[in-house]
Structure formats: structure tokens, C-alpha cells
Amino acid sequence: MNRTTSRQTTSSSSYKRMFGGEGRPSVGMARSTLSSRQYSSPVRSSRMSYSVSAPPSIYASKNVRLRSSAPMPRLSSDTVDFALSDAINSEFKANRTNEKAEMQHLNDRFASYIDKVRFLEQQNKILLAELEQLKGKGASRIGDLYEDEMRDLRRQVDQLTNEKAHVEVDRDNMGEDIERLREKLQDEMIQKEEAEHNLQSFRQDVDNASLARLDLERKVESLQEEIIFLRKLHDEEVAELQAQIQDQHVQIDMDVAKPDLTAALRDVRVQYETLASRNLQDSEDWYKSKFADLSEAANRNTDAIRQAKQEANEYRRQVQALTCEVDSLKGTNESMERQMRELEESFGCEANNFQDTISRLEDDIRNMKDEMARHLREYQDLLNVKMALDIEIATYRKLLEGEESRITTPMPNFSSFNLRESMLEARPMIDNLSKKVVIKTIETRDGHVINESTQNHDDLE
């Protein structure tokens, strides 16, 4: 009796776990009300065989089959075999015990399935709420943020493109200026080479003029020495002639008596004086002409040298100015090229940063789409599991209803041993167990549902 009460309590608690309250009478209660009949029934009980196959896939169905074991034996009203009745009662008792244990096991499994279904329903609700939140707010907000970010990036790219175009125009203008300055530099270098060539030729002319001046100075010195020598010689000759004339005058004075000799000497003296004065005049004229020529040549060479020196100084100043200008232009060119390289590097770095930002945003969008698709797949899997569990719950509910209907069926009383001659044949408690399979197909693409279909199949066993 205690064992029967504990079984009733276990059955009642499992039923409460399954259905959450007091509804229909439990299986254990039905069994306890009919426990007094199981020893007086001569009818062979049909053995229930439950076959529950787990779903191999998402859309697999649960099959629960009820089979009767063997046809009921025919009983004759003429003979009563008490041994057969005891055997039938023992077998019925064993079958009922096995059925109770099996039903208790099934009730426990059903309770665990109910808990699992409730947990999965809670998870399903949470995932549905997250999915609705992602669909309603997250997607639009992310889309708006993505569009805003893309607009900003496009605007920055356009701005950078315009700045790059301006920089390229400035670079082209600078390139043209550099080419023009390079051409000017080439012209100045050519002029510098020509000036250096002219300076070299002028230096040669100056050297030649210096050599000519030195030659002329040496010639002037030699001529001056010659003039001095000639003057000295002339003075000596004049002195000699004067001495001779003085002697002749003395002799003439002394020799007054010789008139012809005096006249001859006077004629000779006149001739010599005339010749000496003419020679002196010629020498002075030649000296003056030579000195004038040399002075003129020296002055001319001095002017040429001074002009050459002035031109050389002018060319030297021009070369220095052009060298300074070339150095300044080279510095300007190097600074412009350095600025252009820095601008290109900065623009390249900014373009790479923007490209990395765009790639990162695209990766984030792709990851969010993948996550949404994964949530949709998980949601679909949970829906499939829920449908499978609903099918299994419905099957177990029908099984329990059939078991309750079988248990609550009134059993015949064999206490009076009034047996009819008609043959009793046990029929299965549940002739046909209908099985309803619902197949729901959802097609998604890029995280969006594009097609959804539901198929209902009724199958009878």
C-alpha cells in the first residue's frame, strides 16, 4: 500500500511538472482506482510497446507506435481453469507493473522535455527580442551611421581630390617655373662660359700687352741710354771740334800771313757745325718721335689694360651674381621638391587611412550581416526544434490520453465465474494514432528572409 501511494505521488508530481496544476486525474490515480480489478480480470492484457525515435534532422518527426502483443485467448464457459486464471492474473500484474514503470519513465522524460521546451521558448523569446531590436533599431542605426560615415568619407575624398588637383596644378606650374629657370640657368651658364672665354682671351691680350709694354720699356731704356751715349759722344765731338776750332783760331791768329788756310778752316768749321747741328736736330727729332710713339703705345696699352681689367671685374661681378642666383634657385627648387614630396606623402598617408577606414567599416558591416544571418539561422533552428518538440509533446499528449482512456475503461468482473461461451478478443486501445508533421521552409539571402512556406502532412499508423 505504501508502494502504491509513493507511485501515486510520483505520478502526480510528474503530471504537475508536465501540466503545471491540477487538471485531469493522473495516470497513477486511475491505476490506483482500478488496482482491485486487476486480479479478477481473466482477459489477457495487451502489451504496449513504445518506440520513440529521436529526430535525425530538423524536420524529422517523432513516431510513437502502439502495438498489441498477441490475440486474446478464447475462454469457454464449460471449463474453468483456476491455474490459467492465476497465470493470467500474474502476467497481467507483471505487465501492469512494467507499464507503470515505463509510464513513470516516460513521465519523467516528458517532464524533462517540458522543462527543455520552456527553456528553449525563453531563449527563443530572448532571441526574438534581440532580432527585433536588431531589425528595428540596430540595422537602421547602423545603416544611418554607415551612410553618414560614407558621406563624410566621400566628402573628404572629394576635398582631397580637389586639393590634389590644385597641388598638381601648382606642381605643374612649379615644374614650368623650374624648367624656365633651368633654361635661364643654362643661358646664364653659356654666357658665363663665354665671359670666361672672353676673359681668358682678354687675359692673354693683357699678358701680350704687358709683354709688349715691357719690350717697349726696355726699348725706351735702351734708346734713352743710346741718346745719352749719343749726347755724350756729341758733346765730346763738339768739345773736340771747339778745341780744334780754338786751336785753329789760335793758329789763324798766329798765322795771319796765311789767309787761304784760315778761310779753308772756317769753311770746314762751318760745315762741321752745320753737320753737327743737323745731326743733333735729327737725333732729337728721332728721339722725340720715338718717345712719342712709345708713350702713345704705352698709353694705348695702358688704356687697353685698364679696360680689360674693368671688363674682367665686370664679368667677375656678373659671374658672382649669377652664381648666387643659381644657388638661390637651386635652394628654391630643392625646397619646392621637398614640399611636393611631403605633400604627396601626406596625401598618400591620408588616402591610405581613409581606405583603411572604409575597409574596416565594410568589414564591420559584413560581420554584422554575418551575425544577423547567424541569428536568423539560430532562430530558424530553434523554430525547427520547437516544432519538433511541439510534435513530440502532441504525440505524448495523445499517448497519455490513450493510456488514460485505456486505464479508465471498466474491466469485466470474474468473481462470479459466469463466463459466456462467446470468445473475447482484445482489441487495441488505440486503433489509429494520427501523426501530423509540419514542415516549415524559410529561405534567406544575405540575412534577409526571401521565401517562407509551410506544409502539413497527416500520417496514420
UniProtKB/Swiss-Prot annotation:
Keywords associated with the record: Coiled coil, Cytoplasm, Cytoskeleton, Intermediate filament, Nucleus
UniProt-annotated site: Stutter, residues: 347
GO cellular component: axon; cytoplasm; cytoskeleton; intermediate filament; nuclear matrix; plasma membrane
Coiled-coil regions listed: 92-127, 150-241, 299-403
Localisation per UniProt entry: Cytoplasm; Cytoplasm, Cytoskeleton; Nucleus matrix
SMART domains noted in UniProt: Filament
Region Disordered, annotated ranges: 1-52
Keyword Nucleus assigned: yes
Top-rank taxon, per record: Eukaryota
GO biological process: intermediate filament organization
Positions of region (Tail): 404-461
Processing after translation: One of the most prominent phosphoproteins in various cells of mesenchymal origin. Phosphorylation is enhanced during cell division, at which time vimentin filaments are significantly reorganized.
Protein name: Vimentin
Organism annotation: Oncorhynchus mykiss
